[in-house]
């Protein structure tokens, strides 16, 4: 199914469902980089928030609708748990439904501030990870050069 058809179907699905205040398509489908294994990635703001059961049911309905796997994340969780992903959703995502533009702009602003406020921590974490990886590789290569002598 082509990107335009997926977008049309998703808009038609969410439009009458008042519980969904914000729906954003992101990922490979939003970028137009659809491959056979691509899934449909959506970020939603529902009032009230979806339970796990409701989230799983929604993903199943969307998979049937789009003919491919669907991953749905709740924006309120994404903002705090994964600020880099939330930032990408707001930066590159395609809004499919925005009930209140002011609410969307406030949420975007909160996500961007949180992303920028935590950027230093992500860089620090990345630096520690690379250093640990470098030490591990150095340890592995020295172990290879110190092979036991034949008796």
Features from the language model and the residues they span:
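Short gly/ser-rich loop at a beta-strand->alpha-helix junction or flexible surface loop bordering the NTP-binding
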Residues: 21-29
């Amino acid at each position: 199914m082509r990107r335009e058809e997926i977008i049309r179907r998703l808009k038609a699905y969410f439009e009458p469902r008042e519980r969904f205040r914000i729906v954003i398509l992101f990922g490979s489908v939003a970028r137009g980089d659809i491959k056979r294994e691509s899934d449909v990635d959506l970020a939603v703001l529902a009032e009230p928030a979806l339970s796990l059961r409701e989230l799983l049911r929604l993903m199943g309905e969307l998979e049937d609708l789009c003919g491919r796997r669907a991953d749905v994340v709740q924006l309120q969780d994404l903002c705090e748990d994964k600020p880099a992903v939330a930032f990408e959703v707001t930066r590159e995502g395609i809004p499919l439904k925005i009930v209140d533009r002011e609410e969307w702009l406030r949420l975007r602003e909160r996500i961007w501030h949180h992303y920028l406020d935590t950027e230093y921590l992500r860089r620090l974490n990345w630096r520690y990870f690379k250093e640990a990886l470098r030490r591990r590789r150095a340890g592995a290569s020295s172990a290879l050069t110190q092979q036991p002598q034949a008796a």
